[in-house]
């Protein structure tokens, strides 16, 4: 039976959530090996999106890119989508109404992720479940796979695409480092 590291599960107050997420992301950003931040969130008002927006200059300095899937988009959010983040980013809208039953998530790297509360709960009205996962490639890998599947099924928002040059630079830098021999 494989060893599973203990998870940091907590219930956090709304006022603390954005700050804790910001600390978690900044702790795990790695300029030497940039990894796109993969985010599934309820809306642009979600604490995880606000935490990422608060770190956008740090993300730029680390050479990172943000890929964001929103469950709820109104006209104003769609207009603001291109200005939500100043770092390189792409935003998509998961139009399927059943997505609201899913949990918010953030993948910071190949071994690090955060799982938030169910998106049907308004984060401004109640305290929320959170799960900080560190040093677990299995959990982060599953979160990344589910993100990619949802990304494929989601619709791009106009004005929210990352500059192609920034995305290509991160991809090229990542592929150069992943070409190193690995243990099988």
Predicted regions and their residues:
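PLD/PLD-like phosphodiesterase catalytic module centered on the HKD motif
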Residues: 1-184
């Amino acid at each position: 039976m494989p060893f599973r590291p203990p998870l940091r599960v907590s219930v956090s107050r709304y006022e603390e959530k954005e700050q804790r997420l910001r600390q978690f992301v900044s702790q795990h950003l790695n300029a030497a090996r940039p990894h796109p931040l993969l985010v599934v969130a309820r809306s642009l008002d979600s604490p995880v999106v606000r935490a990422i927006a608060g770190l956008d200059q740090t993300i730029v300095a680390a050479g990172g890119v943000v890929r964001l899937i929103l469950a709820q988009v109104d006209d104003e959010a769609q207009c603001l989508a291109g200005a939500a983040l100043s770092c390189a980013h792409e935003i998509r809208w998961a139009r399927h109404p059943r997505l609201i039953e899913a949990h918010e998530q953030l993948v910071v790297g190949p071994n690090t992720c955060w799982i938030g509360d169910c998106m049907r709960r308004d984060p401004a009205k109640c305290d929320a479940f959170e799960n900080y996962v560190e040093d677990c490639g299995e959990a982060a890998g599953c979160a990344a796979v589910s993100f990619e599947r949802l990304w494929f099924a989601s619709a791009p928002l106009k004005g929210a695409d990352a500059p192609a040059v920034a995305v290509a630079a991160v991809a090229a830098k990542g592929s150069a480092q992943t070409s190193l021999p690995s243990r099988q």
